[in-house]
Every structure is written in structure tokens, then in C-alpha cells.
Amino acid sequence: MEEMPLRESSPQRAERCKKSWLLCIVALLLMLLCSLGTLIYTSLKPTAIESCMVKFELSSSKWHMTSPKPHCVNTTSDGKLKILQSGTYLIYGQVIPVDKKYIKDNAPFVVQIYKKNDVLQTLMNDFQILPIGGVYELHAGDNIYLKFNSKDHIQKTNTYWGIILMPDLPFIS
């Protein structure tokens, strides 16, 4: 008696099997390329490994740094803050005006944060304490500075501002 296979393999079945293997290989290659692209992108993106913090206080007519010399910023001769490391920065501070009765001119109390020649923030108040700041993406070479409409309007002893480079923190979901 002759043994008969239960199922004969047909050329169509063999062709379908090759197509499904080919499809699986293409899908795996695409996943590998996407993973490799993501890895390259994240490794090339400049990120801050550790934070960097600087605080300034106003003395007589100049800002002076009250913290140790940081690695992410530098002060320029004209009192501006030069960014040395690109990243996300938190700018914070408070500007306290002198009492209104000591003001000789009627100019409004205005404080502005500048990045190069662009205004990042403008604050105006009728001689009240002004909290300043925000979170900004800054790049190496940017210059940041605070500008007042009149230095005679500012209490030098209690006015300060600072900047913190925020480290990129990994989030686990």
C-alpha cells in the first residue's frame, strides 16, 4: 500500500509562505531603523546633565553674582548674562521699588527681561513688588539682561534675579 501525504504542498502555498516571511522581515527592519533613528536623535540632542544656578543682586549701580561661578553662564563687561550652554532655563526674581513718595519723576515703574534685543517679559505696576520670570529655551551665545525704566525707582537691597539651567530628567511612565 502506498503512503499518501495528508496534505500536498502546492506552489501557491509555498508562495504565500515566502510572502509572509518577507513581510515579517520588512516589518522587523523598519522597527530596527526607527529604533536606531531614535537612538541617534536622542544622543545628538544637547541636554543638560546637571542643573546650574546663578543669582544676582543689585549693588550701587551694577549686578553682582552672589553664587559661585557657574559652568552654564558668564557675565559680560556690560552687565549682561551670556548663555554658554543651550537648554531650558528658569528665570526668576523680584524687583522691589522705592516708596512712591521718593520718586521725583512721574515715569511708570517698568521692568523688562531681554534676550539679545527681544523682550521676553514686560512688567508694569504702580510701584508694587514685581515677581519676574518664566521658563525659556535659551541657546549658547544668547545674552539675557534686566532693564528698568529708572534705576532710581529700585530698592537695591531687596531686588534680585537669577537663572537656573533645568536638567533633562528621564520620566518613567
Swiss-Prot record:
Q: Which GO terms describe its molecular function?
A: cytokine activity; identical protein binding; tumor necrosis factor receptor binding; tumor necrosis factor receptor superfamily binding
Glycosylation: residue positions:
74
What's the superkingdom here?
Eukaryota
Q: Name one GO biological process term.
A: regulation of dendritic cell chemotaxis
Q: How does it sit in the membrane?
A: Single-pass type II membrane protein
What post-translational events are described? N-glycosylated.
- How is expression of this protein distributed across tissues? Detected in immature and mature dendritic cells and in macrophages (at protein level). Detected in spleen, lung, heart, thymus, monocytes, macrophages, B-cells and dendritic cells.
InterPro entries in alphabetical order: TNF_dom, TNFSF18, Tumour_necrosis_fac-like_dom
Q: Which UniProt keywords are given for this protein, alphabetically ordered? A: Adaptive immunity, Cell membrane, Cytokine, Disulfide bond, Glycoprotein, Immunity, Membrane, Signal-anchor, Transmembrane, Transmembrane helix
Identify the residue ranges that face the Extracellular compartment according to the record. 42-173
Please report any disulfide bonds recorded for this protein chain, giving both cysteine positions.
52-72
GO cellular component terms listed in the entry, alphabetical order: cell surface; extracellular space; plasma membrane
Does Hydrolase show up as a keyword for this record?
A: no
- Asked if Cell membrane is a keyword of the record, the answer is yes
Query: Where would I find the THD domain in this sequence?
Result: 40-166
Null allele phenotype: Reduced levels of pro-inflammatory macrophages in the peritoneal cavity following injection with thioglycollate broth to induce peritonitis and reduced AGTR1 levels in spleen macrophages.
Q: Where in the cell is it found?
A: Cell membrane
Q: What induces it?
A: Up-regulated by exposure to bacterial lipopolysaccharide (LPS).
Q: Which residues lie on this side of the membrane: Cytoplasmic?
A: 1-20
The regions listed as transmembrane in this protein's record are: 21-41
What's the family? Answer: Belongs to the tumor necrosis factor family.
Function according to Swiss-Prot or TrEMBL: Cytokine that binds to TNFRSF18/AITR/GITR. Regulates T-cell responses. Can function as costimulator and lower the threshold for T-cell activation and T-cell proliferation. Important for interactions between activated T-lymphocytes and endothelial cells. Mediates activation of NF-kappa-B. Triggers increased phosphorylation of STAT1 and up-regulates expression of VCAM1 and ICAM1. Promotes leukocyte adhesion to endothelial cells. Regulates migration of monocytes from the splenic reservoir to sites of inflammation.
Q: How does it assemble?
A: Homotrimer. Homodimer.
Q: What is this protein called?
A: Tumor necrosis factor ligand superfamily member 18
Record the organism. Answer: Mus musculus
Q: Which gene encodes it?
A: Tnfsf18
